[in-house]
Amino acid sequence: MSIKAKNAAHLRESAQVDSGSVQPFTRSQKIYVQGSRPDIRVPMREITLDVTPTDFGGEINAPVTVYDTSGPYTDPNVIIDVRKGLADVRSPWIDSRNDTERLPGLSSNFGQQRLSDAELTALRFAHVRNPRRAKAGANVSQMHYARQGIITAEMEYVAIRENMKLQEARAAGLLTQQHAGHSFGASIPKEITAEFVREEIARGRAIIPANINHVELEPMIIGRNFLVKINGNIGNSALGSSIEEEVAKLTWGIRWGSDTVMDLSTGKHIHETREWIIRNSPVPIGTVPIYQALEKVGGAAEDLTWELFRDTLIEQAEQGVDYFTIHAGVLLRYVPLTAKRVTGIVSRGGSIMAKWCLAHHKENFLYTHFEDICEIMKAYDVSFSLGDGLRPGSIADANDAAQFGELETLGELTKIAWKHDVQTMIEGPGHVPMQLIKENMDKQLECCDEAPFYTLGPLTTDIAPGYDHITSGIGAAMIGWFGCAMLCYVTPKEHLGLPNKDDVKTGIITYKIAAHAADLAKGHPGAQIRDNALSKARFEFRWEDQFNLGLDPDTARSYHDETLPKDSAKVAHFCSMCGPKFCSMKITQEVREYAANQRIEAVDVDVAKGLAEQAERFKQEGSQLYKKV
């Protein structure tokens, strides 16, 4: 089916939410933690646990609260209608600051053209609000407020969200132990407060991507002293995917834990696709505006102009895009440094700007007009994601002069953005072998003065097409531990094709693992609560709790049921790997019971004696390695 035919089927009167995205997780409920005002209601997911079996003490297990990116989609009390979009969360907060104005309509030329095109009526999102903009002379960025000493509702919101009811968890005994972390100089407090959030944003070490026109947003924070976040990419291309499919990818991705989503559409109807996505997104949406600008000139990079790009920025800012990837560090003098690379320039945005620079033999207009861009950003509170257009596309090219030259320029641009109180994060590689990853993180911290780092992986080897979610997940866990604030997911289809829903889920779960492993290694307060709860459930053979506490309950349950599908297996004190006779945890329980009965105090002797008895029993039963269950 052609794109045109697919989108013709996506009528605003008949669009529906993806059914798989609105199912609550088993034994989970959406809870809301209220802040200092009634309209600050911070969503979290609470997982209810079973009582410990009598054999193990019969204690009641407190519910476990986990971070929730799924928005209202998993709240059974909310009626979802993608044709109307999500409820307005932030307008009362924005109104109370009294520094914005409602425009009479779209002010970008392209936005006005699309709105007046009658042929697009069937595709267009029906409930478009008139956009907001800062009043003349005002700066509406979260960084500007933070530097004035103001704690905004958004700052309070993310502080509550980051803590995940940590005090209650400690009181319930869910954090009886947590290994000390090694944070490589990060300053992670025992509890996240709104004042700490304000300080980090004022310092430039964290950002809250929150365009004033994205009122459906549930605010989140990106910074090395907070939980490591992940981004998922969606977007159509000239080869396939409809608007409805992209909205479904959005809702599916946030169900599994995508903290932000980038719309990288390069095909037809980019403007309309983005409107549907933003109006239905509770998470920040990022874009690469140069992609759409290139479409407007028919794909000829040399025909790009500052005026066209400026109009594209305003168009997207008025829709509510929360952060822009802008490749302003690709300078004319750096392009020759890529000539001897194995893989040259692999960034789409980087290659576009390199081609423009060479065609005109002029400096990158994104660099020369950077302060003009800052004026637009602070009028809507769009955050910079300064693009790494010269990132290495192979491990052979890692950490070369082109990559690090651009990084130094991004550091210079960061200071200019901060002069305008514009929130900024820095994008990073790419393909980097493990031994060179820490150098990337250290150099970014030095060049960019601790602005949040946002990396694609990095992929640690180039030999595994089809498995690059794994090659990159390794690098992502490492750089997250070293201080990277957000990890851009990689799917199994990386380098091979556009990801489908299953690929999106696989990429997100892989990166949630990497991010959580980094949080554990950094010693983030409360990071080990979920691990401890799942380990306890595993030791007590509470199978349903094991599934439900995991990042992907569906897959865990499915794997278990492949060999032990009956309900009785959900209470069995063994799994199919070892069977009932050779389960190490069951044996440990028997050893403990024996020690208690015999009043043996020396643990080493106790374990040795117990295992010896198990060995003798094994011999008596015929020394058969495998038994029919």
From Swiss-Prot:
Alphabetical GO biological process terms: thiamine biosynthetic process; thiamine diphosphate biosynthetic process
**Segments traversing the membrane:** none
The EC code for this enzyme is: 4.1.99.17
Q: What class of enzyme is it?
A: lyase
Mind telling me which GO cellular component terms the entry cites?
cytosol
User: Can you tell me which residues bind substrate?
Assistant: 233, 262, 291, 327, 347-349, 388-391, 427, 454
Q: Where does [4Fe-4S] cluster bind?
A: 575, 578, 583
**Which residues are noted in the entry as Zn(2+)-binding?**
431, 495
Q: Which UniProt keywords apply?
A: 4Fe-4S, Iron, Iron-sulfur, Lyase, Metal-binding, S-adenosyl-L-methionine, Thiamine biosynthesis, Zinc
Record pathway? Cofactor biosynthesis; thiamine diphosphate biosynthesis
Q: Which Pfam families match?
A: ThiC-associated (PF13667), ThiC_Rad_SAM (PF01964)
Gene3D superfamilies tied to this protein: 6.10.250.620, Radical SAM ThiC family, central domain
List the molecular function annotations (GO) for this entry. Answer: 4 iron, 4 sulfur cluster binding; carbon-carbon lyase activity; zinc ion binding
Per its record, the protein catalyses: 5-amino-1-(5-phospho-beta-D-ribosyl)imidazole + S-adenosyl-L-methionine = 4-amino-2-methyl-5-(phosphooxymethyl)pyrimidine + CO + 5'-deoxyadenosine + formate + L-methionine + 3 H(+)
Q: Which HAMAP family match?
A: ThiC
Question: What does the subunit comment say?
Answer: Homodimer.
NCBIfam families of this UniProt entry? Answer: PRK09284.1, PRK13352.1, thiC
PANTHER family for the chain:
PHOSPHOMETHYLPYRIMIDINE SYNTHASE, CHLOROPLASTIC, THIAMINE BIOSYNTHESIS PROTEIN THIC
For this entry, the protein name equals: Phosphomethylpyrimidine synthase
Q: Which gene encodes it?
A: thiC
